Amino acid sequence: MSFKSIRLPLALAALVPLMAASTRAPLDLQPESKLTISGTSTVRAFQCQATSFDAKVESSGSSAVAAVLAGEKAVSSVVVTVPTEKLDCRNGTMNEHMRKALKVAQFPTVVFKVNGYELAKATDGVAVTLNGTLTLGGVEKPITVNALAKAGENGTLLVSGTQEVRMTEFGLKPPTLMLGTMKVDERIKVGFDVILKD
């Protein structure tokens, strides 16, 4: 076997990962996306909104939105990062206590990383089961998040859902305000409307 006949297959083999990488494409997070944290207390309910967050979503092709809506697993990775200081509860005192409870000074971000997922057809879209890890207050735990994906405006993909999280499971103490008369329940709900576009 000649040197040239060996070199050709080796060159082709070297191109395979490059070709695979070139087909990966990010899905862009749209500014209309929303993420909220809501809960109850001994006095009243509350809701905090993330004024800024990031979602890095990579797909295995250039038409991932259409593929996902068709029930195809076209997304290859998902990492959502929320700067905890960007949570706004529309109340200065509540903001201060919530940020203290989430240990913002030590752990400035909340991170959700998807390790695997399943899709299933639903009457109003595609049911999505996300299996991943949630890092909150410096503690990482496995979590399963259920969501619904459906077509949004202007060719976008809207992924919506609500997930309950217990603060104490992550070593966090729920906020207490008004000299202890207002105690926040340890169960908070994370709601999201993530809008993505090819």
Model-assigned labels for residue ranges:
Residues M1-L10:
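Bacterial N-terminal signal peptides that target proteins for export
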Residues P9-L18:
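Bacterial N-terminal signal peptides
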Residues A21-D198:
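Low-complexity, acidic/polar, glycine-enriched regions of mature
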